[in-house]
Amino acid sequence: LEPTELFKRSLGLETDVVSKEMYTLDTGADGDNKCLRPEATASTVRAFIENKIQQTLWKVYSWGPMFRHERPQKGRFRQFHQFNLEVIGSDKISEDAQCLKMLDSLFTNFGINEYAIMINFLGTSEERKAYTEKLNKHLDTIVDKICKTCLVRKDKNIMRVFDCKNETCQSLYNDAPKIVDNLGTESEKEWKQLQEQLDLLSVSYTVNPKLVRGLDYYSKTVFEFVSPN
């Protein structure tokens, strides 16, 4: 159990997890509602702060049950176990490359070889804000062609339009501006470094400009391990 407010602040009120998928418990009139944790990063950060951990570089992993209701993703149950790698105290892009290499090695050691690694780079919050304004202008030109779900996301969480499963929408978004083409100098440098380091580590990947992830705290590197079946 965690305070519901923890996830509202960190994940964002308009995310699917907060708006549709959390199991919440009304624990009394004081408004201190609890929920079954839907993910682990916010909980890890809470534990780091509450326990006043002083290490400037804190690397941890965890494994445990998470809970989501309302049409969970394909292949995921309402209670599922999640493995987490967290690094607190460093903004080096090499940490992202290391996490990807570790996960790639983990799957290999498990004998799982049929997957593809998709990566993208979201830049800083300021760069994303500028990009979303450009994306919004583009969507205005095709607003009569996109689905109802994308119309809602356009106003509430615009980058989530790229998660749409509608084939017509996906085809239209092929012409949308790419966030990696709208990065600042430092972010562009980090994006290049990430790809170079993955190449050096022999991690095979595909750049997917539509990969954005669904939580508000995401910035810079985003990735998914995708199964063909």
Predicted features along the sequence, with ranges:
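TRNA-recognition modules of translation machinery and tRNA-sensing kinases, especially anticodon-binding
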Residues: L1-N229
